[in-house]
Swiss-Prot record:
Keywords: Developmental protein, Disulfide bond, Extracellular matrix, Glycoprotein, Lipoprotein, Secreted, Wnt signaling pathway
Name of this chain's protein: Protein Wnt-7a
Organism: Alopias vulpinus (Common thresher shark)
Highest taxon of source: Eukaryota
UniProt main location, coarse: secreted
Length: 123
């Protein structure tokens, strides 16, 4: 008859922004665990939930962590992080140097500066 039927299947990843939202949600719901070793083994045998009363058992798709992330907004001499306090930020920016992002929601002081310099203009 000359007709041809073809079936093509494929899977697509979600849009990058949607994936970011999913990961952020999983990050916010991550459960702290601690490795449990037996006397003979140096490697951990399993991970135990650190606060078992307030959490359910994590699923394979959930995120878990062993140590809390450092707070990069505060100075931490142990990690060498200088924090963001006292650094200059851009009030109108939506990038990494924005005041809202750098100041971690603590608010910020604004200062207006004037600068005069010789421009060596020629007429």
């Amino acid at each position: 008859s000359g007709s041809c039927t073809t079936k093509t299947c494929w899977t697509m990843l979600p849009k990058f922004r949607e994936l970011g939202y999913i990961l952020k949600e999983k990050y916010n719901e991550a459960v702290q665990v601690e490795p449990v070793r037996t006397h003979r083994n140096k490697r951990p045998v399993f991970l135990k939930i650190k606060k078992p009363l307030s959490y359910r058992k994590p699923m394979v798709t959930d995120l878990v962590y062993i140590e809390k992330s450092p707070n990069y907004c505060e100075e931490d001499p142990i990690t060498g992080s200088v924090g963001t306090q006292g650094r200059m930020c851009n009030k109108t920016s939506s990038q990494n140097n924005s005041c809202d992002l750098m100041c971690c929601g603590r608010g910020y002081n604004t200062h207006q500066y004037s600068r005069v310099w010789q421009c060596n203009c020629k007429f």
